[in-house]
């Protein structure tokens, strides 16, 4: 039986950028899934903002933005529609949501691509769309699982600069990578 995490303790302070660095298969994504209460574990607790995270911690989960390694967008929706859809899961007010979507498009630099469908985007632009979908609702905690995998160095640098800006704007960041950057 494979044990991915054993006697694992982790404290991340609000406002911090925390990196989980390790090779593929080392438990980074498993750790994220435990933090998000998507994966059951035998012992212990996970606390986010001082509250215990459980599968039904919906109010707490609204404060979290997640960008997983595998791009998860709808191919039949445009860039704008994808971001609007994911933001709408958290923000019901249409005017506020519209503003948040515009802010996310601006932030990731997809203004010229808002009417494009994902299949027309390069790998780097697709990653930026994935990030926009995860941050559009302006979460306090942003979890990014290998957000720069399989992108060119220029796109990687742009994504890393964006992550630092999100942190400067008050978000706590958990970032996984197998790159030593």
Please describe what each predicted stretch is:
Residues 84, 88, 95-113:
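Conserved ABC ATPase "signature" region
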Residues 76, 117-124:
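Conserved ABC ATPase signature
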Residues 138:
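Conserved catalytic motifs of ABC-family nucleotide-binding domains
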Residues 142-145:
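Catalytic Walker B motif of ABC-type/P-loop ATPase nucleotide-binding domains
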Residues 153-155, 178:
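Helix N-cap at the start of a conserved alpha-helix in ABC-type nucleotide-binding domains
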Residues 44-55, 60:
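Conserved ABC transporter NBD signature motif
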